[in-house]
Amino acid sequence: MKFRSPSSGAQSGTPVTGGRRRVRTIAVGALPVVVMVALLGMTTVPGTDINLTVPFAAEGEGPTYNTLGDVDGTPVVDITGVDADELDETSGNLNMTTVAVRTKMTLPQMMGRWLASDDTVVPLETVIPANSNAEEVARQNAAAFASSESNATVAAMNHLGRPLETMVYDVSEGAPADGTVKINDVITSVDGADVTVPGDVSEAIGDKSPGDEVTLGIDRGGKKETETVTLGEMPDELAGDEDAEAATGGNGKAFLGVTMVAQPADGIRVEYNLKDIGGPSAGLMFSLAVVDKLSPGELSGGEFVAGTGTIASDGTVGPIGGITHKISAAKNAGASVFLVPAGNCSEAASADSGDMTLLEVDTLDGAVDALTAHDKGEDVQTCG
């Protein structure tokens, strides 16, 4: 289309000037759009402290990892200290599943996740509690993940009937045990009574009072030692902390001041090599991987098995969050069987699981039995 000058006597250069003016107008008029598009990806207004994020988080499918496989050339579950003929060559899949959590979203970003994906939008406080921050939650999740690894090993050893012992993981500075008990000591007895797991020590200390003396039998690098400790009073900040590993009996009760972990007593060591994963929900699958590697045959029965669930040291399987997203991730990864904690079964039944079989489990023993029965074509308890 051609444009004419309003004045027939205008010089030939007039239309050119008008065209430049229009170009400038269009360019300047586009600036708000460009700025708006740029702001969509910003969490604060440039040059200010104005926060553009919304108090919501998006939860969706996370990656899955085969606990029988390798990551970057390293076994996800690495077992050492065992004879080669005891370590079973495993194959197949026992995949742990994860949930991807996205925070610090702007309103357009949140709406985009909600409209264009299968993510679930939840209040931010369900992911990052009030009076906390992302860094604190990350530390807590890392600690929970480490705890799940320890529990997975203990539960697997119990299932396999292998002996356990209690190792000192840390000694609180200034605690009654400080200077007497050392990191890596193995506590073998309390006042002459044999102990095998941290709970045995905690129970024995809990029966005493501040000021009492306790005699600990200790294996220190293969050398048998006896140490006597005068118990103190539990600090207020530990009162009611049911997850603390320290040997305590409640506020005002006897306090030793050591953090303990159970480990195999026959020299077996289990190392878990997944990085940047948090939370306790991998416990069941880690424990199954240890059982599978230390027993003949394949728990998967040649199928692609995935699952989730926390694990306690006694083998109890607990519920987790994001079950529908984990089922979806497993289905998309090609799994044919998914292990579901009993506490998640009703929610799992509503998920789009495709042709996957959802096995309901509440203990490690039960999970092993369910996989064995399913492989044989026997009836098993399923969700839904």
What do the predicted segments below correspond to?
Residues 1-24, 115-124:
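Terminal targeting segments of Actinobacterial cell-envelope proteins
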Residues 26-44:
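Hydrophobic membrane-insertion alpha-helices, especially the h-region
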Residues 52-86, 97-101, 117-172, 235-307:
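PDZ/PDZ-like peptide-tail recognition elements
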Residues 157, 177, 184-187, 191, ...:
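Terminal peptide-recognition signature
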Residues 177-200, 204, 219, 327-330, ...:
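Conserved PDZ fold ligand-binding element
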Residues 203-252, 350-374, 379-384:
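PDZ-domain C-terminal substructure recognizer with occasional recognition of PDZ-binding tails
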Residues 280, 293, 305, 313-338:
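Glycine- and Gly-Pro-enriched alpha-helical subdomains that act as flexible
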Residues 340-351:
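Short, glycine/polar-rich helix-capping loops at beta-to-alpha or helix-loop-helix junctions
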